[in-house]
């Protein structure tokens, strides 16, 4: 309630969250049900660069966590003009919401870089309208692991990769472009299967094929993007290879 004035565009959602919380408390903290508030959380309808959202749900976090946690996350939408133009004119994907962390509770102090509605505790499956990808965490993770791997292997890195490892902002924007093209590829082309029919992303080997297909699609697309003057395209190819 105290934070609501800061998130006026979320008022309906946050008011519903309070109701869901009060029901959960009244039921002795049994099985949580945040369906009513989840359906009102629509960051896909407010893709404005720099816009912050407050997310408070009982959820499973990613990376195989079997516990249902009560988490709070404040996100900031990453939607600069160049992303908006590419999404509108070439890679239409109304569910794509690139975000970065403003603050988070302990359950998100992990390597998880996604915020997906299917992880929220609900009495029934909600219709999905959005998927949040934390480009800042993707970039930081890439820089940390690639830097450590190159040092361990004594790998001479391309100059442009060294730029990425030294520049969080550059790498973050690179991942936004990669994610935009990759995510669009999930619903287009020759699918080995529909990945969103299987919420557990299983069997793992089959889902890995789908991820690889989308990454190779993104790699191929960057050739045309670079020819059309998209500066970040060359960095996406490096990110795909070294990731």
Language-model-detected regions and their locations in the chain:
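Conserved helix-loop functional segments at active or binding sites
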Residues: 186, 190-194, 220-227
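Short pre-active-site segment immediately N-terminal to the catalytic Zn-binding motif
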Residues: 161-178
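Contiguous, non-catalytic segments that form substrate-binding/exosite surfaces or channel walls
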Residues: 9-162
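Noncatalytic N-terminal accessory/assembly modules of large enzymes
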Residues: 1-3
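Active-site recognition of the HExxH zinc-binding catalytic motif
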Residues: 175-191
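Post-HEXXH active-site segment of zinc metalloproteases
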Residues: 190-212
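Long, well-structured alpha-helical subdomains associated
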Residues: 172, 219, 223-243
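An active-site-proximal "capping" alpha-helix that borders the catalytic cofactor pocket
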Residues: 207-223
